[in-house]
Design a protein with these regions (language model features):
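Well-ordered beta-strand scaffold positions
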Residues: 26, 66-68, 91
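Short acidic-glycine-tyrosine-enriched beta hairpin
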Residues: 65-81
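Ligand-binding loop in jelly-roll beta-barrel domains
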Residues: 80-105
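Glycine- and acidic-residue-biased ligand/ion/polar-headgroup-sensing regions
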Residues: 47-49, 53-59, 64
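Short histidine-centered beta-strand/loop micro-motifs
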Residues: 18-20, 40-45, 87-88, 107-108
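Conserved short histidine dyad/triad with adjacent acidic residue
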Residues: 14, 29-45
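Short, charged/polar surface micro-motifs in flexible loops or helix N-caps
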Residues: 24-26, 34-38, 58-60, 101-104
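A short, N-terminal "cap"/entry segment at the start of jelly-roll beta-barrel domains
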Residues: 1-26, 108-124
């Protein structure tokens, strides 16, 4: 059994990766809204915080009654209770959304990574 899975993510307005990759610790989606389009609802979560990473374009984020401008290169974290909705700007918007249970991160990067010496690629 392989220790990895690969999924195609091209040419879809929304791709959810939980099922495609059998994710067990987070939900990841890639979302694209055309020019001036909006998510058709406001939502919050019961447990999951969300991290949005804007890949292309710009738009507006309605969050708890406030509207803020968002654009390429920005990352936005929202608590589960935050009431949110995105609207694309005149050039559309493409973003990654990562959901995970608030407060669940116990190890990360240097505290979770382990250097492996018994196998390596040809370029090392």
């Amino acid at each position: 059994m392989k220790n990895y899975q690969v999924a195609k993510t091209l040419n879809e307005p929304r791709v959810e990766l939980k099922e495609a990759l059998n994710l067990t610790g987070c939900e990841v989606s890639i979302n694209e809204l055309p020019a001036n389009a909006s998510v058709p609802f406001v939502h919050a979560h019961k447990q999951n915080e969300e991290l949005y990473i804007i890949l292309e374009g710009d738009g507006e984020l309605f969050i708890d009654g406030e509207v803020i401008a968002v654009g390429k290169g920005e990352a936005i974290r929202i608590d589960p209770e935050g009431k949110r909705c995105f609207k694309a700007g005149k050039n559309g918007i493409k973003m990654i959304c990562i959901q995970s249970k608030k407060g669940s991160l116990e190890q990360y990067t240097m505290s979770d990574g382990v250097i492996v010496d018994d196998v390596k690629p040809s370029w090392l």
